[in-house]
Design a protein with these regions (language model features):
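Glycine-rich Rossmann-fold phosphate-binding loop(s) that bind the pyrophosphate
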Residues: 8-9
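N-terminal Rossmann-fold NAD(P) dinucleotide-binding loop
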Residues: 12-13
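Aromatic pocket-lining residues of Rossmann-like dinucleotide-binding sites
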Residues: 19
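NAD(P)-dependent Rossmann-like dehydrogenase/reductase catalytic/cofactor-binding core
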Residues: 22-24, 174-177, 181, 209-435, ...
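Conserved beta-strand positions in the Rossmann-like core of class I SAM-dependent methyltransferases
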Residues: 27
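Rossmann-like NAD(P)-binding element
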Residues: 31-35, 48-111, 119, 322, ...
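Amphipathic alpha-helical segments at domain termini/boundaries
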Residues: 64-83, 164-173, 179-181, 396-405
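Rossmann-fold NAD(P)-binding glycine/threonine-rich loop
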Residues: 97-146, 153-166, 338-391
Length: 517
């Protein structure tokens, strides 16, 4: 296939390398000829590196470069061009102008594809004389390594184009998912679940960025915490995406932005690229502060209180602490000196203190969510005795013989604690994507694991917990906070009620009105 790529920036050169390596003839062009030269040099250096590392032969590298053709004029006639991929700056007027000029230069048989990450594919296509020829083809940077591509048909896109683009993408070694033309498409939309909830937790002073990041990594198993991720991406970029998707979905509560970001963006606290963000960077930046040492009395007796519905979590915590040698009291209530540990699921320690008459100074929350690493989370209320909290942290840090001690994060009491809130938001946003038929459930999980690097897809993650337990969590968060961002989605509610998995697309009305044959 002969492919013309318009735009020789980071994304355009990555797409060019990917397509040429897969055996396609690629015309690479830009209104700035120096950008094309730099892009070809970059691709050459990447291919040379691949040869040095033994991932490609010298002959294949040379053949790939021969298939990469620098083009001086983006609007040159191209009777043999079969596909155009536009990768210019993210501006509607610029993109429509590019396609308008290409429409005059290329044959009517050429398929047009835009690499837009945030603009409406339908609006870009609407400026063409033939809007049926255009679709979205959204790659992720760096293209050769990020092996997922979103195929986005516009409202007028010919039905044969998305399957053809899918076949092309998958023949070149990447995976393709078909996504509805909605704000943020799939991956950027799904990614809002983590960062918006992390910002909400920071607003509430539940923990600082380092606390929340540690919990995200060590409990949820994410490669990076949300604040580390925002610093890597750039807060200016992240905040703009959050605002754009929220506005695009008409201020949906689940996608609500934080008041924290505008001032930080204005102050230039963008992250790694400016040297300061949620963390400091550079040779003169101070080293990250270590976690406070564990200093309490690990032998102080504890009583594990199982609130209604949490008997299983309470029993599991008792068993784990007993195996670690902790002094775990039994009976109907705690002794006068015992710490009270309360496993919370979408609720607060404060509610347990009020509802069950627990000693406010000695009662603490423990997140029962199974940890990916060796970290536990202790929640403290405003009434907590600091000495008792230090002792509770020491007890939770205990480990069975031969095991590493647990790290213990101390956070402010909030509904569901940190990890539950983050996971509930991740699952809820993904469920909303499936519910709106923006993408199929399997594609949601595929795109999120490939595009965001999550250890498991969000819907499959919810299934690991159980649809009924996820619904219980969403309902408890909504009931406890009153915040509509935690309102259970129809997708989770129905599947919990019907005994279906969150990954199950279910039966649609269309399935019931036509024969399978």
């Amino acid at each position: 296939m002969r492919i013309r790529i318009v735009g020789a920036g980071a994304m355009g050169r990555g797409i060019a390398q990917w397509a040429a390596t897969a055996g396609h003839t690629v015309e690479l062009c830009d209104v700035r000829t120096e950008a094309v030269t730099a892009a070809v040099d970059f691709v050459r250096s990447m291919l040379e590196r691949a040869v040095q590392k033994g991932r490609m032969s010298a002959e294949d590298s040379a053949a790939t470069l021969e298939r990469l053709i620098p083009l001086d004029d983006p609007w040159a006639q191209g009777p043999d061009v079969e596909l155009v991929v536009e990768a210019v700056r993210e501006d509607l007027d610029t993109k429509t102008e590019v396609f308008g000029r290409l429409e005059k230069a290329l044959p009517a048989t050429a398929v047009f594809a835009t690499n837009t990450s945030s603009l409406s594919v339908t609006r870009i296509a609407a400026a063409l004389e033939d809007p049926t020829r255009l679709a979205g083809l959204h790659f992720f940077n760096p293209v050769p390594l990020m092996k997922i591509v979103e195929i986005v048909p516009g409202a007028a896109t010919r039905p044969e184009i998305p399957p053809a683009l899918t076949a092309l993408v998958e023949s070149c070694g990447h995976r393709a998912v078909t996504v509805a033309d909605t704000p943020g498409f799939l991956v950027n939309h799904a990614g809002r679940g983590l960062v918006t909830e992390a910002l909400a937790l920071l607003e509430e002073k539940v923990g600082d960025p380092a606390d929340i990041d540690r919990i995200a990594r060590d409990v949820l198993g994410l490669r990076m915490g949300p604040f580390e991720l925002m610093d890597l991406t750039g807060l200016d970029v992240t905040a703009a995406v959050i605002d754009s998707i929220w506005q695009g979905f008409r201020h949906a509560d689940r996608l609500r932005p934080s008041y924290l970001t505008p001032n930080r963006v204005a102050a230039g606290l963008h992250g790694r690229k400016t040297g300061r963000g949620w963390y400091a960077y550079g040779p003169e930046a101070p080293a990250p502060a270590p976690e406070p040492p564990v200093t309490g009395d690990a032998d102080r007796p504890v009583f594990v209180h199982g609130t209604e519905g949490q008997a299983r979590d309470a029993a599991a915590l008792r068993t784990a602490l007993t195996a670690a040698g902790a002094v775990v009291e039994t009976g109907d209530g705690p002794s006068a000196d015992a710490l009270v540990l309360v496993p919370v699921w979408g609720t607060t320690v404060a509610a347990a203190v009020a509802g069950y008459g627990l000693p406010a100074g000695r009662a603490f929350g423990v997140d029962p969510l199974a940890a990916a690493g060796r970290r536990r989370v202790l929640a403290v209320t405003p009434a907590a005795d600091p000495a008792a909290a230090r002792d509770a942290r020491a007890v939770l840090a205990r480990a069975a013989q031969g095991e590493e001690p647990w790290a213990v994060s101390v956070v402010r009491d909030t509904a569901g604690s940190v990890a539950q809130r983050l996971l509930a938001s991740i699952v809820s946003v993904a469920a909303g994507i499936a519910e709106r038929s923006i993408a199929a459930p399997a594609d949601v999980d595929l795109a999120v694991t490939a595009g965001l690097g999550y250890p498991v897809g969000p819907l499959a993650w919810g299934d690991r917990i159980g649809a009924d337990r996820m619904l219980e969590l969403h309902r408890a968060l909504h009931r406890t906070t009153g915040d509509p961002r935690h309102r259970p989605s129809r997708w989770v509610t129905e599947r919990a009620q019907l005994g279906l998995a969150l990954t199950d697309p279910g039966t649609s009305p269309a399935d019931c009105t036509s024969d399978a044959s």
